[in-house]
């Protein structure tokens, strides 16, 4: 027999099943509205360990056995769920905090059904409108049951942190048309947001912001060249010029970046010589004059995935055009922040940035005055 993990792509329920290879018979080990992972089987017994989690329940360890488990039932501290015994019950302290609830948002773009995840505070004051941050990369909805551990950010918003501080967070799925990656993101994200506003009346459509990192950072930069719908945006490690990015390398490996545009994620589908206009229209830097949305960029000078100069090109272009833009550079850091102190610093600055534009908070000094390289503290 073998053990397989089952997953429902519509409801996002999951579980483990034991299948007899001779008869085809299937036996349920565990299945339900939660995320099942970290599976282990006993070496000499038909007994299994695994974890289950939901947005409101931290990953806990469970035990299931096809053998006699009456000995486990004698332990009062063990809770039984669907014939599996819960061995741990961790993170009870979260009951003291405002925690997210998650809702599936169904919408359509390019004639296809898409899904997105909307996180909101479990309870909020009646009549109080919520600001919303839209985070995106490509597809995310399969993570419906993922527990969101609060932690300093390496590059993206922490859902639990922002929801506990009075925000809604929406994460839409995106599909792409080759040659039109930026336009595809724009359409899918806007369609998802339209549906959110129809369903969740607490969202303030005048206080919505964007956030993305890497490929998500590129899409963020593209969106603000095409729409003024969003009050502010934060782009991490964004490609801004597909021509110069195509001709660059991944500094961490020395790998050419050309394949990415011709064949994979960047989805242009041609070389610049055969698809000049596609490269131009999908490059945010050439439309920087259209930007009215305040933008925060993070791009680190030791980024081995997206050339640091991509963030610099976008920042310098927007500065020259006197647009509202800020750039964070963590010297020596990579594509995503590694040092905890830097992660904490970024988390604070992202919160202050979004609070200023979406919650009418005071403008922090670093946004009001800036800081030159010479003024940055030197590590000892």
Model-assigned labels for residue ranges:
Residues 136-137, 299:
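The conserved beta1-alpha1 loop
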Residues 11-13, 58-59, 142-144, 243, ...:
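Glycine/Thr-rich phosphate-binding loops of Rossmann-like dinucleotide-binding domains
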Residues 131-135, 169:
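Hydrophobic beta-strand anchors of alpha/beta hydrolase catalytic cores
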Residues 149-380:
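Active-site-proximal cap/loop segments of hydrolase catalytic domains
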Residues 140-142, 169:
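Serine-hydrolase catalytic-loop signature spanning alpha/beta hydrolases and amidase-signature enzymes
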Residues 5, 13-124, 128, 152, ...:
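Non-catalytic accessory segments flanking enzyme active sites
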